[in-house]
Amino acid sequence: LCVLTATPPKQTDILHAYHWKDAKTNTVTISDHPKAGYREIITEYRVLQQQNGLCLAEITLHTGRTHQIRAHMAHIHAPLAGDSKYGDRRKNESLHLKHQLLCAYQLQFHPEADSCLAYLNGKTVTAPLPDFVSRFFPTFSSKNRK
């Protein structure tokens, strides 16, 4: 679950791109086309609510790469609120944000059958909504997540 400082181009989408990490600067670069050294990434998003120029979105990772959510959403011109690395500095300052508004509110387990975590297969763990949701989206409730 995250807050974006712009609305993505579609209400829901599955994004396919390529990701390269610069270990020296601890930043990543996203490309729409395959390149040497880049790894495929797949990020799914769904807009849950929009208000006052901000967008509450649910993100599902189909791959898990460094800064994937942050960089991929910035790549489509919908950066995370509070993100000092890939985000909109001016908007972050105007909102008085010092950290990114991103929270893993739900985890689903799909381990390999022979894994020591196999007993968790199909289990879902859901956390309460983070405080930033009520701060920026006071009319949103957990029932809207379905």
Regions found by a protein language model. Give the residues of each.
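RNA pseudouridine synthases
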Residues: 1-146
